[in-house]
Each structure stands twice: as structure tokens, then as C-alpha cells.
Amino acid sequence: MSDMSLKDLAKDLNKSEEILVKQFADAGIKKSASDKVSLAEKQTLTSFLQKQHGGESKTKMTLQRKTKSTLNVKGSTGQAKAVQVEVRKKRTYVKRSDSETQETQAAELADQQAANDKLQAEIEAKKLLVEKALAEKLAAKKEADEKAKKAAAANKEKQTAVKSEKTAEQIASEKESAALLKKADQEASAKAEKETAQQAADAKKLVEENSARWAEEETARKKAAEGGDYHITSSKEAQAAEDVLDSKAEGPSRRKKKKKAPVEEKFQGRRTRRGKKQRPATPSALQQAFEKPAAPVERNVRIGETITVAELANKMAVKATEVIKAMMKMGAMATINQVIDQETATIVAEEMGHKVILTKENELEEAVMAEAQQGGDRTSRAPVVTIMGHVDHGKTSLLDYIRRAKVADGEAGGITQHIGAYHVETDKGMISFLDTPGHAAFTSMRSRGAKATDIVILVVAADDGVMPQTIEAIQHAKAAKVPLIVAVNKIDKEGADFDRVKSELSQHNIISEEWGGENIFTYVSAKVGTGVDGLLESILLQAEMLDLSAVAKGPAAGVVIESRLDKGRGPVASILVQHGELKLGDILLCGLEYGRVRAMRDENGKPIEVAGPSIPVEVLGLSGVPMAGDEATVVKDEKKAREVALYRQGKFRDIKLARQQKAKLDNMFANMEAGEVSELNIVLKADVQGSLEAICESLNKLSTDEVKVNIIGRGVGGITETDASLASASGAIVIGFNVRADASARKLIENEGVDLHYYSIIYGLIDEVRAAMSGLLAPEYRQEITGIADVREVFKSPKIGAIAGCMVTEGTIKRNNPIRVLRENIVIYEGVLESLRRFRDDLSEVRNGMECGIGVKNYNDVRVGDQIEVFETIEIKRTL
């Protein structure tokens, strides 16, 4: 290093020139501000200043660390791009003074000395306790020995004093004294041993308590040591400085810290593929471990009425495969998403060692229904009368005369296809009527009518007598345990035979009062009106005998008679109120649907606000089209009504899936044996729910082993574009019963060529479907013999082979027809007639009594006396 001026040195050292000149003078070097300063002179000055100030070193040190790394980052184009990352760290370390270090060391020595003194005192206390216990044991033993010696001496003196022969009493006394002596010795020894054991146990307890306390203190020291703030850096100097600093701050507990496990050191400083060393891994302070349960865990499993296999496994905290295995061991096959009943789930859970708690899923439903069933004052109500009978026996005409309105004209074909609900005011009171269909397809609708009624009027035509639907109506009335009034209609027609009607009805236990029975018979004419007043009187008389009553005030309850989807008004339900009052704004729960009553209309279409018992009304505002026959109940809370409806929908779906699964398993082998079955796919739309249900039931009954009716889509309301798309995709025919397709659906049906049919009478619908099913039946084939020829001679042809010279004995022989060669009435060959000639001319056919030459294709073994039988196959169409 070159010499520099004193002025420049003063600037570098941040000192004035006068102070620097004075310091050089004190060091024995004379300098002025303009003089040069050599390296040796600088060292001399530095040594002088260090001696003068005691050689103090720096108390503060600042370390700076800079690390660079490269990151590969994907850019917007998707290509990798290298990014340089530089991390800078700066730490300052302050050196403690010697006095602080000495104080820390003195404190450490004092703590260590105190711990050693404490340990020594405890050891001395233990020694004293043990020595004391031994001394007490020796003293007790010595005392027992002295007592024994005294007793022996006393016995000896007694023996010396008494020199006579020992008596039996003396021997007994000697034995007693010996036993007493032995007992005293044993008691003394036991007492000494007990005291010694007690003292040893106390000493051991003291040692254990001290050991536990020392272990806790040691653990606390270790935790305190491990809880320190360590600064991990890649610089060795900085790490060493931090270790020294931390050890001084933590004291002796730092020295007792264990070394790192070799497993942790194993992976430190590994080289990567690029050759650079990785940073040492920081040991994780958080350690977690799973301990296997010592015994199987018993859980409380809550099981409802239905549950899937996956849900059951989740509640038992096991895999679904384990549940399936357990079910297979018990002989039940199941899949992970299959719904199983409560009983099966209970058996499986108990088999797997869990406690089962059975729950009712319909608790909310029961609570809501209990709230709705409020008691009140019961008052008399009007009777609900259902008119039943065979088709075209005059049920609707009779009701029409009673209502003084033409109802039958509104029904297509003059037959009733809906349940009509009406109430009639008479001079003697009000009567509510339900008019049911008489056709065979409407069995379920008649059944609903019988269940919702008080009295059944059985209409029987005087000229027809008892018919199949008449018998069915009698069965429905008996099943519902409803009184039955027979109305013999059409008494004004020729051929009316009352006795015949009575006789036929008596075969079904319907006996008139005239013949000593219980059933009321009335004779009416719906056309003229004869006997109608007597019928009404009979109805009211029967109602008085039944003493009909209902709660007039309070929440309403009833039954859904019919339902439909109106294009402008939405879901419409016809409800017969049975209890309470149904008002506008009430929250109504109908089976799977719910909603607020937005509007109510009577049977004439007039708006009303309140409907009491035995009044049929049309209700608007439900969430969907309810099923006919569902119970309708007014509830207080709309939220609860929605929850109950959703629960019922889920339950209905589960039951439906379970039934389908059962049907699949039951019919699996039957389907495998049956092979291919033709299917007629149908998309069915009807105007009301009852008609839809009746048509579906009738169509399903048409299915046979060879042709199956598959209703892939059904609904209430007009034919929509969705229905047309479904039919197009599945190759189905679209049937509309009293409904029409909208514009978009008609366009799609026309473009896709979907088969669309409209019907207003159920007879025509069923006949058309039956005809379509007949077209799907596989045709039958029958073989018909057209001619027989006897072989008289056999010729050889170089081109064809054997030619049979024949005489046609029956029918006509036609060329290219299939033939059979018979020898002694046994078929030996079946083939095709290839050549047919007569006098070298090729002919298309040869009639009876003519000779011809016949060449059989691929057959040369024709002999004289054989018969050639010519036949044709005729296709015969089958019908259901």
C-alpha cells in the first residue's frame, strides 16, 4: 500500500488533523499536516492506541448475506422462463461485556452448586431413614429375645421347685406357656417387619416423588431450550455467532440439549442434480402420530326407515366394502348405492358390533299432522253420495236430472271419464254427489270414490241387469263398508224386468227390503224424472240414520278427488272438504305437493272464499299436480309443509327404486330365458290425473310375453316439445288424451316424423294400441303343399345331372319352389326345384295329369318310385 498524506488519513478516520498530529506525537512520531504517513507508522499508531485504551475490540458486528437462485416460471405463451431471485439478509450481533459474562457464569455455578447441595441433602436423608429402620428392627428383635429368655428362666425355676411327677395339668400348662411364648415372639417379629416395610415404602415414595419432580424440571428445561428462536442461515460464521449468543442467553439448559438424531443429519447437505448442495432441512417441531385403538370402537348408529349401504358404512366409520361383505355373509346381495330397509340395516350394524338406535323419519310429518287435527264442536254435515254402476246405465243422466243441467253432453262419447263432484241444494237439505266412470279402465277412480263417500247409489239399467262393472261397484262399496242404495234406471224402456234385476243382485248379497233384506231399492227414470224425489228422500233418510257429523270450524282436511295441469292457471286440484273450513290463503299439504291457496272455485266455476265440510272445490296454487286420492291438510307453517312434502317425495322415490331393484332381481333369470321381447314405447299425456292413471293401468294390462307396453313418459297437460324430443329419441308414439300439442311440439313432430295420436274416448285408445302391438308380433309361417309328382324314370343330363321323369298326380308343380324328395313316405332330401321341362320346353308350371322332367338342385340320387313334393311357405299375421 502506498504512503498517504496525514490530511487524507484524517479524512478517512473522520478525525481532525490536530488530534491526529497529537496522537502521532504521543506515539513518538513527529508529524505535520502536510507530511506523508507510511504503513509502518500507521501500525505503530494503532498499537499505541490499543495499549492506551486497553486493547478493546468491537462490541458490535453486522453480517450481510446475499443468496441467489433461479425459478422456472411459465409465461403467457406456456413456455418456461428463468427468473433470477436474489435474497438479502442483514443481522447485527452485539458482544456482551466481561462483567455480564462473569455474572452469568457465577449465576450458573451458584445454580449448579444449589442443585448439588439439594441432591446431597436428600441422599443423606434417605440414608438416615434406612439406618433408623434397621436400628428399630434390631431393637425389636433384641427385646423379643430377652422376653423369651425370661420366660425360659421362670419355667426352669418352676420345674426346680416342683420335683414331683408331672401331672396332666402341668403338661397342659407347659404347652400353654410354650404357645404363648411362641405367639409373643411372632407378634414382635411381625411388628418389626411391618414397621420396617412401612419405613422402606415411605422412603421409596419420597424417592419416586423427587424423581418425578426432577423429571418434570428436566422436561421444562428442555422445552424452554427447544422453544428458543433459532436463526438458520447458510453462513457458517453467522451460525456460529448465533449459537454462542443463544447459549449465553439460555444458560445451562442449552448445554443439556440432546444432539440431533442421525436420521435428520442423514439428509442434510445432499447434492442436487445440478451439483449444488441443498440447504439443511429444518427439523419440524410439530409431530403427529396415529395410535391404533386397543379395542373395537362401539358406536351408536341411528337408522331410519330406509338407508343406503354407503350411508350405513359412513355412520359406522367403516368402508362400504366391509358392509357389503357382511351382507354377503348373511346371504344378501347389495351394491354401494342400494337402499336397504330398517330391519336389514339393524341386523348388519349389530353383526358388526355397534349399538343401533331406531329413528322415525316421519317425526316432523306426524307432528304437523297432529297440529292440524285440532278438536272442536262437531255439527251435522251433508252426506257425500257416490253414483256407481256399469257404463251407459244412466249414472250421469240421473245426476244431470237432479242438477237440472246437461252434464253428460260435455263428456266425450257420452261416457264419464272424470270424477265429477257437485253439491245440490234440495228442499230437505244439501247433498254432495260424486259421479264416477263406469268403464273397466277406471277401477281405481271408482275405488277412490267409494272411500271418500258416505252412501253409494248403485245404478242398474232395468233392461240390461247386472253387468261386470256393476259387480265391481258392489265389491268397492263392501270394501269401504258403505251403505248401498240401488237405483233401478230406465224403467220407462221396453223390456224392463225388475224381478230379474233383484234376482241377479241377490246373488251378490244385495237383497231388497221387499224380499226381507237391508238394501233400499228405488225405481227411477233419468229421462223423465220418475222416482227421483223418492231417491233423494231415501238418501237423506239413510244420512239421518248414519248421524253424519264433522268439525265445522278449524283447519280443513279433505281428499283430492281429481287433479290436472291447466295451461293458464297451473296445477288445479279438485278437493272434497271433509272437516273444518278451507279458506283463501291457507297453506295446503296434498300428498307430495304443497302450496298456498291462491284461488278457489266451486263446480260451476264461480270463485268462493270459504268451503265447509262436504263441499267440493277446485284449488289453485299448489307446487305441482297431486295424485288423485291423496289427503289434503291445512298446516300452519309453510316451511314445515315444504319439508314434509320433500320428505314424502324422497320416500316415494326410495320405495320406487327398491321396488324396481326387487323386480330386476326377481325377473333376472326369466328375462335371460325369454330372450328378446318386442317393446311398444309410448309417451302418454292426459287432461287429468285420474284418466292418466286409468289409461296407464289399462295399457300395462295389454302386455304379453312377446310384446310389452313400455310407458316411458307420462304427465298431465298438453304435449310439449320435451315430450316430442323424448318420443323421437326413443322411437315412441305420442298419445294425447283430451289434450293437444303446442306449436313447437307440432313442428318437431313433423320434422322428426314422430307418430302422434289424439283420443277423446278410452275405447278407441286401447283398440289402437292393441292393433299396434299386433303389428309387433312375430308372424307365423305355414307350409302348404302345392303339388306331388311320382318319379317314373331317371335320365342323365351332362349339364344338370340326374333328371327325374315324373307324372304330376296332385296339384301343380311350379319352378323355383322348395321341394322334398320322399322315399317310402320318408323325407330324404329337401331343396329347390332347379329345372322343369316338358318335351324340351322350359315351363314355369305343370298341372295335374301331365308328364314332365324335374331337375333337383345339388341332388343326383333320385330313384324310380320316389315322390317329389312341392310346397310354398305362407306368412300368417297374428293378432292379440
UniProtKB/Swiss-Prot annotation:
Residues 525-527 are annotated as: G5. Residues 389-396 are annotated as: G1. GO terms for cellular component: cytosol. CDD domains: IF2_eIF5B (cd01887), IF2_mtIF2_II (cd03702), mtIF2_IVc (cd03692). It is found in: Cytoplasm. Disulfide bonds: none annotated. Keywords: Cytoplasm, GTP-binding, Initiation factor, Nucleotide-binding, Protein biosynthesis. Residues 142-229 have a biased composition (Basic and acidic residues). Residues 380-549 form the tr-type G domain. The keyword GTP-binding applies. Its main location: cytoplasm. InterPro entries: DNA-bd_dom_put_sf (IPR009061), EF-G-like_DII (IPR053905), EFTu-like_2 (IPR004161), IF2_assoc_dom_bac (IPR013575), IF2_II (IPR044145), IF2_N (IPR006847), P-loop_NTPase (IPR027417), Small_GTP-bd (IPR005225). Belongs to the TRAFAC class translation factor GTPase superfamily. Classic translation factor GTPase family. IF-2 subfamily. This is Translation initiation factor IF-2. The gene is infB.
